[in-house]
């Protein structure tokens, strides 16, 4: 089973919405979400980064954070969705913007090798 990690800043709006949407779009799949800030609802950590086959981040700043904090070896599994931080959880516009980007990411997720086998 593929493991996907969704990352935004506070793990409050964008990444939880994306995680729920992608779980609906492509079950069965292990999907969780986290934030880059220490105050995030679920702060990103080494274990989450190591376990994920693919890491979908909302902004390039999140990709840089992951590479700087957890190492270059994780850069190849990061997909930047380019979703700015101006939405609230399950906002209709956020869902509308996320869906096509997640569909595109699903193609990358399916093509990504599964290291846990």
Q: What feature does the model see in each segment?
A:
Residues 1-117:
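Short polar/charged helix/loop
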């Amino acid at each position: 089973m593929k493991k996907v990690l969704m990352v935004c800043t506070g793990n409050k709006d964008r990444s939880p919405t994306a995680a729920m949407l992608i779980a609906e779009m492509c079950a069965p799949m292990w999907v969780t979400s986290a934030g880059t800030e220490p105050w995030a609802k679920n702060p990103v950590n080494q274990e989450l980064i190591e376990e994920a086959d693919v890491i979908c981040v909302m902004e390039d700043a999140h990709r840089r954070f992951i590479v700087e904090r957890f190492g270059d070896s994780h850069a190849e599994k990061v997909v930047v969705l380019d979703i700015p931080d101006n939405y609230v959880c399950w906002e209709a516009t956020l869902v509308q913007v996320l869906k096509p980007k997640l569909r595109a990411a699903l193609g990358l997720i399916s093509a990504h090798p599964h290291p846990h086998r």
